[in-house]
Amino acid sequence: MLHEPHASSTQETQLLYGHCAEVLGTDGLWLNVRGPDGYEGWMHDGYTAPSELDKFIKWAWDIESEISMGCSVRDSRGATLDLPLGAVIGDGHVIAGRALDMAHRRATFPPTADAIVASTTALFQGTYYQWGGITPWGADCSGMLQSIFALHGIHLLRDAWQQATQGAAVDCSLEDARPADLLFFSDREDGHITHVAMAIGGSQAVHIALGRGGHCLESFSQPDDYTRALAGRFRFARRIVA
């Protein structure tokens, strides 16, 4: 999903294979769409296929059928598709990698703090920073956390400043935050939230950051120059998982 209806526009977020969106308007072959999280942007018609209204699913992560954990599928036409974490398998047949239906996703990825921390540190390890990305193929800070929490059955909004309105306020320092608490940062004078990380315990956090090139673990008890600067921008924490 792009900011404006042309190919050189900035990517705002992503809609994955099999996910639904509402069409708000058109500009030639470009569609102005609203995703399941309320985010709006532009997509070219070539990336879309019509869907019956009664089949519209607000959150594709909640469907009963299989979702990719990172796999390759062969579709009904015999074409091979590589699908990232979160894409819907649909009528495809998995030929490599893994896909899980709802029952197996809920059993494998429960909505608990320890499980969420494990997924965030493992599934996005090695991911590079990509503005607007939401998958291990490239993600930004809030995109990674939105996808991870969705995998565990918890819906977060898209941007860091929006996620900062969710859950419960927590009065704690960076060192005292509990595993899976969201940590919010700002580099603006008005305090507007511009970055989010997740506490993993032991005075550590995991995030995707441009300054690190992507996925990274930070230690606030043994900081380097980057981590000290990051800590200076800390504003508050929110607890999503009780």
Task: For every predicted segment, state its role.
Residues Y128-P179:
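Catalytic cysteine-centered active-site loop
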Residues Y128, I134, S186-H195, A209-C216:
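Active-site loop architecture of trypsin-fold serine endopeptidases
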Residues D176-D190:
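A structural-propensity feature for long, helix-poor, extended segments
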Residues L2-E4, R74, S186:
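Core beta-strand residues in small-molecule sensory/regulatory alpha/beta domains
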